[in-house]
Amino acid sequence: MPLGLGRRKKAPPLVENEEAEPGRGGLGVGEPGPLGGGGSGGPQMGLPPPPPALRPRLVFHTQLAHGSPTGRIEGFTNVKELYGKIAEAFRLPTAEVMFCTLNTHKVDMDKLLGGQIGLEDFIFAHVKGQRKEVEVFKSEDALGLTITDNGAGYAFIKRIKEGSVIDHIHLISVGDMIEAINGQSLLGCRHYEVARLLKELPRGRTFTLKLTEPRKAFDMISQRSAGGRPGSGPQLGTGRGTLRLRSRGPATVEDLPSAFEEKAIEKVDDLLESYMGIRDTELAATMVELGKDKRNPDELAEALDERLGDFAFPDEFVFDVWGAIGDAKVGRY
């Protein structure tokens, strides 16, 4: 487990205060005091003005997953900015940051940082390690891969199905970033684009994957894991709020998802894996948010087309999403 450097008498608070911008609100500066100048009802000549109003500032603790001192980051509104802040804190090129996990230094895809961060979550950044090229013979239509991405241009393996084509190739592991297929660069591609390319590869042919694995500490070099189910392992984050990172628009501090929303997001994420070979809790959360107040599947389809038209979801998938949201609403899990 990575350790922080040095001894600390008291950990700094996660929420600090900073000065508000000048000119916000009336501070009474320059207003005349009581006649005679001796009263205490207004500001006096020669004294500094009252302190400006304070506003909360969100500060998160972070480490490099393979081991580093503890850094503190703030002032980001999306995943790309988050990676930039992490790189700045540890003096790394931003492109070295592959993905982040919450409250564990392990390559645990159930703890992957997506679109939400608990206000007391500890962020572990996984950076690029060994590069490798692997030849794969596509003996079946399905390779057994589930793809996700980091929201900043890197697609990587989130899950490997047991007994699948890829499962028999032990050089390929969960967490490996897919840089290229047959020499075609995939940097900047979304997960669904990579999944589609893999699906379209002809059966009975050999193809080449160029991969980069996360850098490992000595205690992390062990047999690979195909990924567990959500909710496994200790829940270390205790913040009651969550910072919602959006690809468009500012980040917002929100309450934790309700039980209905959590279950609906999980079911929609399962549908994304089943239909498209990807997992993306942020995308699933957006779909639940769009669908929870819709009255029928047609309204949901219209909302998805307007907000997420690039995905071109098939009608049967939209219908299943509508059903999953409806089941979660009535507690039919």
From Swiss-Prot:
Main location group: cytoplasm
Residue list for modification Phosphoserine: 68, 222, 225, 232, 247
PROSITE patterns registered for this protein in UniProt: PDZ (PS50106)
CDD domains: GH2_GIPC, PDZ_GIPC1
Ranges of biased composition (kind: Gly residues): 23-44, 228-240
Cleavable signal peptide: none
Modification type Phosphothreonine: residues: 242
Domain PDZ: 133-213
Annotated protein name in UniProt: PDZ domain-containing protein GIPC1
Lineage, top ranks: Eukaryota, Metazoa, Chordata, Craniata, Vertebrata
